[in-house]
Swiss-Prot record:
Needed cofactors: Zn(2+)
Pfam families membership: Amidohydro_1
The name this protein goes by in its record: Dihydroorotase
Keywords from the UniProt entry: Hydrolase, Metal-binding, Pyrimidine biosynthesis, Zinc
Active-site residues annotated for this sequence: D306
Cofactor binding note: Binds 2 Zn(2+) ions per subunit.
Lineage, top ranks: Bacteria, Pseudomonadati, Thermodesulfobacteriota, Desulfuromonadia, Desulfuromonadales
């Protein structure tokens, strides 16, 4: 499919672009960019007036639940949710059933992604065998099979010596390590952020320092081994401070946060709302402010969703036993666009956080509209109003704290390798 995208505001931080331009796509690649381009014969014209034309959004942290947990989500339904949210590439975490700790399962995920035929689906392999934290997984085989990173996401690597060796081996193999950072001895039986609200609700709390201590350890290990490390789902002011200081020292650390951490506080748990239960938990107002400041100054490199679908039966229970996590692929873009409207980020910075940076960290060769690049493109209407409604979500699951709320901004077209896979 060949396309001429006209009249759009092209924003591409990789080239320092933010201006009204036309974009010609031929044979799945960006062929030309300029003003007043003429459509060759047989080219479909896409009118992008009023829209931002950006490199396809990349979500480096999703849970697609396949294999083994398809009652929550599967690769096809997750891919549908991704393209509806404007994502052209997603990286799926390995905490499936069985976990993705061998090349056969990694290849299965890639094959199922291609079968779905919507977005690019990249597997993240386990950091340790069986995700048990006892010995390292076969990183070389996982990379050879197509894994773009390794992680035991969902649980931390408790053994510091094992984490040190993981960082050293991964550095040699040039595969990113994604750290789920929490000190389980401090987490204990906590189910929400420790503070005034947890006390008022009579729920056991998780102190912020549980995250801070674990991140400090992993940052120090990365510094000691001169290895890169990526910290997942940063949620505390202390974590932002630790990572900011580490970057100033030249430590090779990158990190991500998710929209719920710069949008909601633990007040959302009031009423024992299980759709506000996640790990790490929602924090307090000063943490939200710190996350927003970290996004603004570049301490936080990436906005990811941590899309975590769960069946209603796993959420419609007492708060203490409810599953952690919320869906995010279809709500991430409007929640993040609010940062632009509020002056926290420029539109170019937002595209960096949601496309360029995650692509660079994972080595995807995406996140750019440069001539000759793969034509993964998202068209965004930043002012389009819409309401989050269960029957209109593409995901199998509906566990979101924003159900029934009005959003502003959406992807109106998602293009993968020059093919329009979604239109709003």
């Amino acid at each position: 499919m060949n396309l001429l995208i006209q009249n759009g505001r092209v924003i591409d931080p990789s080239q320092g672009l933010d201006e009204e331009l036309d974009l010609l796509v031929e044979n799945g690649l960006v062929r030309e960019m300029g003003r007043g381009l003429t459509a060759p014969a047989g080219v479909e014209i896409v009118d992008a007036a009023g829209c931002c034309v950006v490199p396809g959004l990349v979500d480096m942290h999703v849970h697609l639940r396949e294999p083994g947990l398809e009652y929550k989500e599967d690769i096809e339904s997750g891919s549908r949710a991704a393209v509806a949210g404007g994502f052209t590439s997603i990286a799926c975490m390995p905490n499936t059933k069985p976990v993705i700790d061998n090349k056969a399962l990694a290849r299965y995920v890639i094959a199922r992604g291609r079968e779905a035929g919507l977005c690019n689906v990249f597997p993240v392999g386990c950091l340790t065998a069986g995700s048990k934290g006892e010995r390292l997984a076969e990183m070389g085989e996982l990379k050879e099979a197509g894994c773009v990173a390794v992680s035991d996401d969902g649980r931390p690597v408790v053994n510091a010596e094992l984490m040190r060796r993981a960082l050293e081996y991964a550095r040699g193999m040039q595969i990113p390590v994604i750290s789920h950072a929490e000190d389980l001895s401090l987490v204990g039986e906590g189910v929400m952020n420790e503070g005034f609200t947890s006390t008022e609700l009579g729920l056991k709390g998780i102190p912020r320092v549980a995250e801070d201590i674990a991140i400090a350890r992993d940052v120090m290990l990365a510094e000691y081994t001169n290895s890169p490390i990526h910290i997942a789902h940063v949620s505390t002011s202390g974590a932002v401070r630790i990572i900011r200081n580490a970057k100033l020292r030249g430590v090779r650390v990158t990190c991500e946060t998710a929209p719920h951490y710069f949008t909601l506080t633990d007040d959302a748990v009031r009423g024992y709302n299980t759709n506000a239960k996640m790990n790490p938990p929602l924090r307090e107002a000063d943490d939200v402010a710190a996350i927003r400041a970290g996004l603004s100054d570049g301490t936080i490199d990436v906005i990811a969703t941590d899309h975590a679908p769960h069946h209603l039966d796993e959420k419609d229970v007492e708060f203490n036993v409810a599953a952690n996590g919320i869906i995010g692929l279809e709500t991430s873009l409007p929640l993040s666009l609010a940062l632009v409207e509020q002056g926290v980020l420029t539109m170019s910075q937002l595209v960096e956080r949601m496309s360029c940076c995650p692509s660079l960290i994972l080595g995807l060769e995406r996140g750019t509209l440069a001539k000759g690049a793969v034509a993964d493109i998202t068209l965004i209407d930043p002012t389009l109003p819409w309401v989050v409604e269960a029957d209109k979500l593409a995901s199998k699951s509906t566990n979101t704290p924003w159900m029934g709320q009005e959003m502003k901004g959406a992807a109106v077209a998602t293009i993968v390798a020059g093919r329009v896979v979604y239109r709003r």
